[in-house]
Amino acid sequence: MNHNRLGKSGLRVPELSFGTGTFGGGNDLFKAWGSTDAGGASRLIDVCLEHGVSMFDTADVYSDGLAEKILGQAIKGKRNRLLISTKVTFNTGDGANDFGSSRQHLIEAVDKCLQRLEVDHIDLLQLHGQDSNTPVEETLATLDQLVRAGKVRYIGGSNFSGWHMMKSLAVSDRYGYPRHVAHQIYYSLLNRDYEWELMPLAEDQGVGAMVWSPLGWGKLTGKIRRGQPAKPGTRAHDIAGTGPHFEEERLFRIIDALDVVAEQTGKSIPQIALNWLLGKKTVANVIIGARDEQQLIDNIGATGWSLSAEQNALLETASDVSPAYPVWHQRGFPQLNEPR
């Protein structure tokens, strides 16, 4: 398993991490993702560690905290072999301060995460969403306090706008606070919006991308394709209408291209879609999920090989989409935006 530096930091992370959204199934939303218990989680974690996947991503809202509890139980005796990333910011209760990136919420949220995980520190704490109501200075001063207290090692954001990430980095630089070294983002062959604004920012500022839902909300498994809708009662059918809007014909073009590459390489469609991401600049880590060992091993098979230039070009062309303004305008003046 290759390791990459996470942004400008000295922290090295495996190119794949394991997402725990399938742990617990503690409410209707997460039951649809999975309901892995502590025993099943322990087996999946052992498989991950055997294959070099030594980073585990979770969040306080996953199954109302149950995912963190199960992860904590499953890693007992293994803590020194792995990295934990978790996320806070979204609603965890009905109180007026049970959400957001305020000092009040962050300190309480981190303490509760540590209790559920049964650990003394979090390797990477990410703000799960952009809080435009709390002053960035307050948020970063609090994160600085948590780092100095030894409760958190590194910080990052998730689902931020470009302006908010840049403002956060500027405030950190001004006051000497820890910088966001990671940005957990939605990115796949089906959803390439990250490339327009956030990728150039990440490259310029040294922010490593951690990719969530790398199979496009489950659309890039090969189970949904032209003339072959997912069978009723299957997970592929259940998620067919979920997630961000997408153009169906574009999805089918991408699947057709993946089929061509699969025939050439002998790799599965998910493996190819994941491998394409691993080759993208600024991507430090791709978060995979699995509800059973076979699915996990198949996803890990995305590593250890590379797409050819021709195969990569085929996938790039099939998945291309017109960018939003001002990116389409900037592309009309390539002499002003030459690659470094």
Where are the model-predicted features located?
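Short, well-ordered coil/turn segments that N-cap beta-strands
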Residues: L11-L16, H51-M55, K78-L82, V119-D123, ...
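Conserved, mostly hydrophobic/aromatic
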Residues: L6, F18, A41, F56, ...
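Aromatic-lined glycan-binding groove of carbohydrate-active enzymes
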Residues: Y194-T234, S268
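Generic structural signal for well-ordered alpha-helices
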Residues: I45, E68, G72, V110-L114, ...
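Active-site beta-loop-alpha junctions enriched in small/polar residues
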Residues: G21-F23, A59-V61, K87-N91, L127-Q130, ...
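N-terminal binding-site loop/beta-alpha segment at the start of enzyme catalytic domains
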Residues: M1-L82, R148
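Glycine/proline-rich, positively charged
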Residues: N27, G93-E197
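Terminal-tail/helix-coil boundary detector
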Residues: N2, S42, D204, Q228-V260, ...
